[in-house]
């Protein structure tokens, strides 16, 4: 009879990281990475049970930040720099939720892409 011995994998500790927040009109995606860009934890409003228009609410962004930061704290993450992008209304509440998680914030960068007369925008809605 063969017996297998399970060895518990040791989690590496990361003290300095980057938080990428993508706030679109439809969803909020939060990713915690280390300095090299390797993902530590990730969450979105859709993965936290929000569906449809509720994914784009500030409360959904707050819950998403809470869930992703819980996983990141297991790795010992303490100091972060924030990179926030996108046109969504959830940006402000996502930032406030991060400040409430007791991280040391070193920098805040806005990485929203701004079109310089690129692709033609979609036609205006007629309701």
UniProtKB/Swiss-Prot annotation:
What's a Pfam family this protein contains? Ribosomal_S11
Q: Does the keyword NAD apply?
A: no
Q: Which SUPFAM superfamilies match?
A: Translational machinery components (SSF53137)
Coiled coil ranges: none
Q: Which UniProt keywords apply?
A: Ribonucleoprotein, Ribosomal protein, RNA-binding, rRNA-binding
InterPro entries documented for this protein: Ribosomal_uS11, Ribosomal_uS11_bac-type, Ribosomal_uS11_CS, Ribosomal_uS11_sf
GO MF, one term, reads: structural constituent of ribosome
Q: Is the Ribonucleoprotein keyword given for this protein?
A: yes
- Cellular component GO terms, alphabetically? ribonucleoprotein complex; ribosome
A biological-process GO annotation? translation
Functional summary from the UniProt entry: Located on the platform of the 30S subunit, it bridges several disparate RNA helices of the 16S rRNA. Forms part of the Shine-Dalgarno cleft in the 70S ribosome.
Task: Say which family it is in.
Answer: Belongs to the universal ribosomal protein uS11 family.
Q: Subunit info?
A: Part of the 30S ribosomal subunit. Interacts with proteins S7 and S18. Binds to IF-3.
- PANTHER family found in the cross-reference section: 40S RIBOSOMAL PROTEIN S14/30S RIBOSOMAL PROTEIN S11
User: What is the name attached to this protein's record?
Assistant: Small ribosomal subunit protein uS11
Recorded name of the encoding gene: rpsK
